[in-house]
Amino acid sequence: MHKNNLPKYFLFVDKYEKNILKNDITNLGIIYRNYSKKQNESDIYRLRSYCNKKKFKFYISNNLKLAVKFKTDGIYIPSFNKRITFNKVNLNKNFKIIGSAHNQIEIKKKLDQGCEAIFLSPLFKIAKNRKYLGVCKFKLLTLKYEKKFIALGGIRKKNINTLGMLNIYGMAGITYLKKNRPKNLGRFL
């Protein structure tokens, strides 16, 4: 197994696809989150194998039992999960807890849940949500805490270079990372 440092790039997927990426990104974490239907364990197994082969980190969203069963690199706690707290004594020492937040209250909750990195979103305007943080609010929120923040939401080619102005550890996406090569990702990291 590879070193268990947090990746700089994260990709959200809801199912296994043979060619998840059309590029050669390294330092990538894949987060399996499927909220629309029952968790497909064969998809999880294939994603775990794919990540091992490509030396990517693999995380499961919101299901500690599956994360332990499939020996993932960690768990992703979505912003709507306000109650889970973990006892890391029972987990592998390299097991990472990461989570997402949309505001200061949710950031504090993720800190209480023991998250090592927090996905702060949406940074830019996205189709499904009229509210977004914008560069100024995002930067103010991240400067308050000594934590690794990952930008998420609305990241596109036209605004990728804006990430260089932010206090971030990395970036995450659902579609942008699938299509763009690392050289097109800007110099923000």
Sequence positions of predicted segments:
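Hydrophobic faces of well-ordered beta-strands that scaffold small-molecule active sites
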Residues: 7-13, 28-32, 58-60, 75-77, ...
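Internal catalytic-core helix/loop-beta-alpha segment
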Residues: 94-127
